[in-house]
């Protein structure tokens, strides 16, 4: 009897369910749930998606109509200005859509929803960034598809299967790189006013300092230098090369700049390198902010 009293009795509740199963969501499930939330936001308020389609479409129609009677050989050989412009507007559409990708996350910060996510028992806080990046990349690609379709009705010839793969790769690289930078800005800047101001300041200068609206040799020397440093110029010229060449290859010269000739393969390597640099920069910023 004494030995039984000396024994320690451990009381345990009888559970009818396993608590660990409630919080055992994988990273993919978290990303899927967060993307579903963002999809519902766009479904209920599609104005942002429509604006991202209408704005570049107006550029394509109105600016293309402005130079409708321009000589065929004025900008490039045997190419109308509408065909010349469409490549620039396609890249500009992906750039603009990706640049706005930090706004939903910024509003989540200001309205307190991000704090709820950070205090939730997530498998990884990286799912917050991956879901936003994946969703905004898909939105930008949807906008690009609409602009590509519109450009076909304005005289652009459709790409073949191989050209479409390289074209899609360049669009994806531009979109992912700019999306990561925009998400980093949404954590760095104090509010949505500053982020909107940054977008307004950066958007049009990047367009006019690239080869989207005019070829490089039309520009003064100082603007040629700026356009040569603009990554959008390389993506635009690569897209333009795919549209204008049937038998394209990775080693043929695409754009001539002051320090050498750039081929299609070098453009893709450059875009990949810029994405890697952006990913490294953004990862360091997000680690500091999320932790």
Swiss-Prot record:
Keywords: Chloroplast, Membrane, Plastid, Transmembrane, Transmembrane helix, Transport. Signal peptide: none annotated. It is found in: Plastid, Chloroplast membrane. The chain crosses the membrane at residues 47-67, 87-107, 135-155, 165-185, 195-215, 262-282. The keyword Chloroplast applies. One of its GO terms (cellular component) is ATP-binding cassette (ABC) transporter complex. InterPro entries: ABC2_TM (IPR013525), ABC2_TM_bact-type (IPR047817), ABC_2_transport (IPR000412), T7SS_ABC-Transporter (IPR051328). Residues 47-289 form the ABC transmembrane type-2 domain. One of its GO terms (molecular function) is ABC-type transporter activity. Its main location: plastid. The keyword Transmembrane applies. PROSITE patterns: ABC_TM2. Belongs to the ABC-2 integral membrane protein family. PANTHER family: TRANSPORT PERMEASE PROTEIN, TRANSPORT PERMEASE YVFS-RELATED. This is Putative transport permease ycf38. The lineage of its organism: Eukaryota, Rhodophyta, Bangiophyceae, Bangiales, Bangiaceae. The gene is ycf38.
